[in-house]
Amino acid sequence: MGGVAAGTRWIHHVRRLSAAKVSTDALERGQSRVIDASLTLIRERAKLKAELLRALGGVKASACLLGVPLGHNSSFLQGPAFAPPRIREAIWCGSTNSSTEEGKELNDPRVLTDVGDVPIQEIRDCGVEDDRLMNVVSESVKTVMEEDPLRPLVLGGDHSISYPVVRAVSEKLGGPVDILHLDAHPDIYDAFEGNIYSHASSFARIMEGGYARRLLQVGIRSITKEGREQGKRFGVEQYEMRTFSKDREKLESLKLGEGVKGVYISVDVDCLDPAFAPGVSHIEPGGLSFRDVLNILHNLQGDVVAGDVVEFNPQRDTVDGMTAMVAAKLVRELTAKISK
Amino acid sequence: MGGVAAGTRWIHHVRRLSAAKVSTDALERGQSRVIDASLTLIRERAKLKAELLRALGGVKASACLLGVPLGHNSSFLQGPAFAPPRIREAIWCGSTNSSTEEGKELNDPRVLTDVGDVPIQEIRDCGVEDDRLMNVVSESVKTVMEEDPLRPLVLGGDHSISYPVVRAVSEKLGGPVDILHLDAHPDIYDAFEGNIYSHASSFARIMEGGYARRLLQVGIRSITKEGREQGKRFGVEQYEMRTFSKDREKLESLKLGEGVKGVYISVDVDCLDPAFAPGVSHIEPGGLSFRDVLNILHNLQGDVVAGDVVEFNPQRDTVDGMTAMVAAKLVRELTAKISK
Amino acid sequence: MGGVAAGTRWIHHVRRLSAAKVSTDALERGQSRVIDASLTLIRERAKLKAELLRALGGVKASACLLGVPLGHNSSFLQGPAFAPPRIREAIWCGSTNSSTEEGKELNDPRVLTDVGDVPIQEIRDCGVEDDRLMNVVSESVKTVMEEDPLRPLVLGGDHSISYPVVRAVSEKLGGPVDILHLDAHPDIYDAFEGNIYSHASSFARIMEGGYARRLLQVGIRSITKEGREQGKRFGVEQYEMRTFSKDREKLESLKLGEGVKGVYISVDVDCLDPAFAPGVSHIEPGGLSFRDVLNILHNLQGDVVAGDVVEFNPQRDTVDGMTAMVAAKLVRELTAKISK
Amino acid sequence: MGGVAAGTRWIHHVRRLSAAKVSTDALERGQSRVIDASLTLIRERAKLKAELLRALGGVKASACLLGVPLGHNSSFLQGPAFAPPRIREAIWCGSTNSSTEEGKELNDPRVLTDVGDVPIQEIRDCGVEDDRLMNVVSESVKTVMEEDPLRPLVLGGDHSISYPVVRAVSEKLGGPVDILHLDAHPDIYDAFEGNIYSHASSFARIMEGGYARRLLQVGIRSITKEGREQGKRFGVEQYEMRTFSKDREKLESLKLGEGVKGVYISVDVDCLDPAFAPGVSHIEPGGLSFRDVLNILHNLQGDVVAGDVVEFNPQRDTVDGMTAMVAAKLVRELTAKISK
Amino acid sequence: MGGVAAGTRWIHHVRRLSAAKVSTDALERGQSRVIDASLTLIRERAKLKAELLRALGGVKASACLLGVPLGHNSSFLQGPAFAPPRIREAIWCGSTNSSTEEGKELNDPRVLTDVGDVPIQEIRDCGVEDDRLMNVVSESVKTVMEEDPLRPLVLGGDHSISYPVVRAVSEKLGGPVDILHLDAHPDIYDAFEGNIYSHASSFARIMEGGYARRLLQVGIRSITKEGREQGKRFGVEQYEMRTFSKDREKLESLKLGEGVKGVYISVDVDCLDPAFAPGVSHIEPGGLSFRDVLNILHNLQGDVVAGDVVEFNPQRDTVDGMTAMVAAKLVRELTAKISK
Amino acid sequence: MGGVAAGTRWIHHVRRLSAAKVSTDALERGQSRVIDASLTLIRERAKLKAELLRALGGVKASACLLGVPLGHNSSFLQGPAFAPPRIREAIWCGSTNSSTEEGKELNDPRVLTDVGDVPIQEIRDCGVEDDRLMNVVSESVKTVMEEDPLRPLVLGGDHSISYPVVRAVSEKLGGPVDILHLDAHPDIYDAFEGNIYSHASSFARIMEGGYARRLLQVGIRSITKEGREQGKRFGVEQYEMRTFSKDREKLESLKLGEGVKGVYISVDVDCLDPAFAPGVSHIEPGGLSFRDVLNILHNLQGDVVAGDVVEFNPQRDTVDGMTAMVAAKLVRELTAKISK
């Protein structure tokens, strides 16, 4: 029951139709108008929020949520397309207070804003292909960055979205970033089942594009020979769980982003052991504890310019939404790293 | 854990800000731009889909899905805000075939199209109040009706959305409709806990506005004295479950909409007994079976100009999404009534 | 994981102790003091509630909840011991309104009061045996009936409690009653696995004791040869589900209780098909719908002097507590039959 | 997560191996030895059980369970491969008594025996293809029928198994049977996604083979144009749910099997509404109630020579196994029809 | 669906009634009689159990369970009111043996006794306000302590109960105690949403009252600025999870209670990471492992005079009751610390 | 709902029958034929697989799965009888890749083969007693070991199966092995509730038989006085969780099997904390993390000649089958230790 089946079928409809009676030109004009309207909606919200923040004053950087409900580049389950609204709900849910662990006040509007979701399903349902869709994601990210002091904190969606997001961040800032990538998998395969935009290939695309200087992968415990070879080829620093007890000290005192445009943090919720985050598509036992992740994030030194939290799959969560709370706390603590 | 808590908090932010340093004018201009962009996005998708349908030809009326993910006017739980994407997923899910029970082919693009969701949460999060929000819903419905041969089939959301939807349908067609309303509750209270837009009051607003000639309520089994008095006041035909075995024959041979602008069908998923539809906010035992509902719908005579399926709450569904399948089949069978 | 395992073990402790060093007399005195204190607590609550009702005036009969959290006489699962607080929660839960289907206002304190639970586990844990425990249940019921205008509406617990409850009702009123008994099973076996107080034997005890004139059993679909023979022996009117479509008309126009002390209604939640009430210990497909039960109850003529709702097992309910809502609605509609 | 993925992958291993270094002959000899051993195991158990029954005497026909844990011919989910042990557990589970509704004693060994499962996964894992696998199923059924007075009552598995089972029954008895087929779907498509053994095609195979004279399909509510055309082509009597209220009387007084070799009953658990049987792969609302099914079965006149209960999917059942109990009760009541 | 909604509504009834026709005096007399009966029931059980223990001889201190099913002072969910019977069930459940990890035999009646629950809901339902209710809790604790060698081990309920319990312990012993408090939250706010008895304020009340000399808080990871300031104001030793890896050694070798009346241990189940204890109202990732908690408890030196296990919420537990088993093991290991 | 209830009842049937009319001889002959056929089926599959492996060449040792679906020797729940097919499904499930953590390729047929399940239930259902059944398990293991290069990796079933498995391994190899036993319980009681084949006694049987030289037990946290005494009596090295932080270093550098016939690894899934493996019969908080287990296994030096993974109970697993994935990963990583 893929989350985007409707879109998938419509693409066929649209193709069939256009093959039959509608000119390609007319179709593409229609699609472009839909895409433009989508970006306009994000732009107007970013503008409004940023104006308000600037009126308040005293903010240097402020985390701004942008949802990318895209699940169709997953190899196994497509539920992450449903994640953004569930994460937002959990962020503001009354079961916890409004402070982060180190004392940032989320109730202060200068700390966290939101520009809503890129209308991914609506665009796909108009027959727009993946190349162009990935560009829409990139454009959306840039639209947010356009508005000072907003910095994009992206809610996935599957991990395929990290490629267009990091590309946009790097292009907008004018150079590569350092990436801290927490994940059970390296997501660095050349292509997965022929899909170059697969959620298992995003970091191959990022490294090929030169959007990152250093790439540190932490939490890895499902990796093939090709995954290790690609890691070497791109100079990736892969920290596997097998040796985490030895690497822990180093990982709890990272310093990143100097000499480049800053730090990007990409958190795949499955970096956590499934005991801590059961609501993921790929259950891979032997992962990090939630505290392990916080220890790494809290102690990281560097200017965090953007980030993402991806691969939370609400269709696999417990009935009480434990993983939604986990994803939300990750977003909250990342917000504390970004906003200042 | 209300589905729209984020929005709720932001409204306060926005008010605080505007009270402090931002002029009301500037804020309203920003909100208007966001609303305009939202409507533009729906318009562009409706245009594109309708153009394609018209190019195909031979269609007199075609059901067009419009999601309204609004849950904050509910008195108990707000999960219906998450329903539209789950219903879409279930409509196209591979577990069933593409024919309706009476043989309509949903794979034929002339039968069913989709213009996506009204970005309710994004608009609320900009501080837009309910009056204006309800207008946005109405405008969205009219935008769809603008494009021949599209007819709106709205995915809720809670039942408060039926008011702006029916209002739009009636205003656009230029006169009242007949309404078949399947529900456990009459939703006709003057106001609920002071909220005139409450999901328990939508049909009071509809009747006051003169948007309906006849209103038939079927499945009723949770009704107070006020509910029965309001029913009498507005001339509502209330069929309570207590007497369903006697009313069944009449309800399985309805003829509606003659002399007015057509028939509107509003299906609250909780019209069904919770055995058949556990994923609802208000579990009220003693309801209709799914077959009872189909027998009423299949045998209804009349020109169905629009409809809605509301109050499915995915946060209360079974782990297999049984109620999502139920909501989806309701949408499929309503599509068969609308499209021709 | 029996709900009363703690009690079971303590009984052994107490026996061992008393065998060893404590005189039987001393032990029994202690037990008696505990039992007296238990009954005093119920009496004081009944008195206070009844005083308030009488001060209000105009009440002829008022349903009064009495919980009997006893599960250890069940043959399969003992979860019904946890039911009473869950049913109370569901009765007052904000998801439904305060009117019964026929218009009784539960918010009116004259309609429904509550004297809490018999402290079954506490008493058993002091080493009190079943004979004496059953007497405590009977005494508790009589204590409630002592206070005009209270009529006991008992929340089980398993079905073994109907014996001491009906016995108390009959003894207090001074003669037999007619019983409407809704159940998947006849519960009329001479003894089950040697336990004469078994939940499968309560109606054998009732008939032997002469506490009932007529006993109508409806919903029966799990019955052995012995069950049918016992039925004949005691003159029970057994309506099996196999012939329900033929018996329906008769059962929807019952007139009971004339010439005796009134009508007692005992509802085993498993009379319903498990589709409507999954939270029961004995899943027996092929039962009544919730509407079938309401049709029988609403149309019953007779003076209902007391009743019970038993065998709801919260440990088998859905995560949303659907069966708790079902049990609560049964209690609400029975309240409407009793109070006047 | 297909229930037979292991087998699927091994088939590839075996093919690759055999392509490489192992002669086809050697491989086929090995496979044949495995198949022979499998059939021997069933034969020995059938022999032992039948000997014991014959020693007891007085039995004319006795239902004998045969599990066929095959799920790989399903189009959507493959969980039915896990069903047979779960159904057995539920049949003997202590939560219900040992009598069927009409008084057959299942504790009497003359009424119900069991020869275990065909080792489907083990055989497939040796690289055996579907043609041959279907023959193994047929041979297993014949092996049971070989032993008087055993009559096969087959536990699926998906619906694809009905073809080899009915074929075996008909071939063994020397002529066609009449089939009562309860299902949401007609399963009569020529082939499904190219698979002629698909669970959606079994009854096309049966009718083509001449194994049935009359085929009555009851509960149908998901059927395409092709399904109806195939129905006509083969002279199938299709009773759709749309008209069930009209057909009910006729279906509750069926007389079948006269002039042919007897009656075969095939019950797809999804003939029931998902409210009554949520544990199925294809949730199709609007089905029969459990009582509807029992009314049809109890009133059927005819000599039932064999039957099956298929498509129960334990991976979609409720946590309490409600559908397992439903499947088990179907088996119990079918046993009562067969044994005499 | 608050666990005490019934009580809440009744309070209104009682107030309305008393306003109208019943004298305040009469009402208060009735309430007092109910409270007296409640305390008598606890006293009689404590007496009986203590007599038996003393007859056995050789016991210096013995843990005695006292349930306090109070959930209405919670800010978010009120399910902890249902916890005590579930914890008792799990303590004696057959899935584990009767020894604690360090070898205490729970089957020895000298090690663990039980005086049942304070009838919180029954008392509230009579219109008794929180001030008086808290006194009833205190009196119940003192009643247990009256009977040598019983020491109270309290089963919550929400954390608001720790205030009246500690107060009673301190008053009864005649001086302050040292408190080891395991929790995700400091529960030391001056008042929460205006409620001075809130479960978020209990330790503010305790410190103000001078009932504790040292207060050590371990597991803290959701704390606001006010929480830290209150901590300083009262001289609380707050150990936050952020620094747990550094504090671990110190916390695994605590020595408490010297020079005061002993040690009190208060365990909020949410001190554990939700992976280990999902059944809590406030899911706060990043907590202690179960082994972390045991290491702290096993190595603690001091005379433990009383304790509590609070905030287990059965309505959020897994279907198998994992958190019930966790709460039960906490009770078992605390029992081993107390009894000697 | 015991997993083998059917079998249990049949045993009674068979006994009754044989007592009555069938000679013991005839019955035993029938049983022997069934047992022979069962072993033949395993032998033929082992032969075929081993032939193929030998044809491929270059394999010294290859893990070969053998399922033993036996649950009736459990003291609490019997669900482990359903485990083998669920573990197989999870091993090959598409959610993870085919490499083990240290790079073994499971897609290489030389690394992992499968001979299916011992038909335990079928044999028991023929009235075969436990003594003989245990011999069948032993014979099955030897049958696998007969075929070079296969080494048995057994899928339980409850822990009682380790006794016949280890016995077979030791007898076949001609001497004792060293055993690494990961478990929450020592399983070394003389007998449990009179059952010498209990899952709580298997290691007592193994030590008595001299099948092991060293026995290391890791993860122990539920142990009685008898358990510790039996440990001493047999010279078992018991590592309790209470001291795991101190023992960790030693356990992460084990060297076993020198001077004996090799190493046997027995993994009871409940060695893990229930947070990591909720799907077990005995929830015992305070266990190992999944990474702890992998660290011990990865660093173990020794020739692993066979192993088992037992006590996974699918009836207690999460709806997503998290524990199935955990059991499968244990099997995968053990495969990597065995195959070379």
Swiss-Prot record, chains A, B, C, D, E, F:
Mn(2+) 1 binds at H159, D183, D187, D268. Its cofactor is Mn(2+). GO terms for cellular component: mitochondrion. Keywords: Arginine metabolism, Hydrolase, Manganese, Metal-binding, Mitochondrion, Transit peptide. Belongs to the arginase family. Catalyzes the hydrolysis of L-arginine to urea and L-ornithine. The latter can be utilized in the urea cycle or as a precursor for the synthesis of both polyamines and proline. This is Arginase 1, mitochondrial. It comes from Oryza sativa subsp. indica.
